[in-house]
Amino acid sequence: MAKKVQAYVKLQVAAGMANPSPPVGPALGQQGVNIMEFCKAFNAKTESIEKGLPIPVVITVYSDRSFTFVTKTPPAAVLLKKAAGIKSGSGKPNKDKVGTVTSAQVREIAETKAADMTGASIDDMMRSIEGTARSMGLVVEG
């Protein structure tokens, strides 16, 4: 018999740095999941990714308190900030520009995000990421 799904928990956890403190502890403790087991499994799965990069994760909790999880690619905004070398986006993106990214960097980010954005071509993903860049106050060159 298949396991019955009790809940889906969506979190953003820093790669290789999952620990029982918030937000992981309270979210999983509420569902009765073994928090340390998740932290060890998540850290092992994300050890090849740059430490500290926020990784979205969807945890499926079953009625017998077991779980599975799927990691996604980092948010486009985080990858854009890293590519542009900035700490944060602009508060007034239409007036204050805080940095620039090249089309090549946008394509690289689109190819990284391709695993999560199903059904879209690379060009469509590039347009989406360029829009995110503009809304952050970044100038897209090329």
Curated annotation (Swiss-Prot):
Q: What is this protein called?
A: Large ribosomal subunit protein uL11
Q: What is the lineage of its organism?
A: Bacteria, Pseudomonadati, Pseudomonadota, Gammaproteobacteria, Enterobacterales
Pfam family for this entry, one: Ribosomal_L11
Q: Does the keyword rRNA-binding apply?
A: yes
Its Gene Ontology cellular component terms are:
cytosolic large ribosomal subunit
**What PTMs does it carry?**
One or more lysine residues are methylated.
In terms of domain of life, where is this protein from? Bacteria
The record's Gene Ontology biological-process terms are:
translation
- Gene name for this UniProt entry: rplK
Function recorded in the entry: Forms part of the ribosomal stalk which helps the ribosome interact with GTP-bound translation factors.
Q: Which SMART domains match?
A: RL11
SUPFAM superfamilies referenced in this protein's UniProt entry, alphabetically: Ribosomal L11/L12e N-terminal domain, Ribosomal protein L11, C-terminal domain
Which UniProt keywords are present, listed alphabetically?
Methylation, Ribonucleoprotein, Ribosomal protein, RNA-binding, rRNA-binding
Q: Subunit composition?
A: Part of the ribosomal stalk of the 50S ribosomal subunit. Interacts with L10 and the large rRNA to form the base of the stalk. L10 forms an elongated spine to which L12 dimers bind in a sequential fashion forming a multimeric L10(L12)X complex.
Is Manganese tagged as a keyword? no
Report the leader peptide range.
Answer: none
Q: What is an example of a GO molecular function annotated in this UniProt entry?
A: structural constituent of ribosome
Q: Which organism is it from?
A: Yersinia enterocolitica serotype O:8 / biotype 1B (strain NCTC 13174 / 8081)
Q: Which family does it belong to?
A: Belongs to the universal ribosomal protein uL11 family.
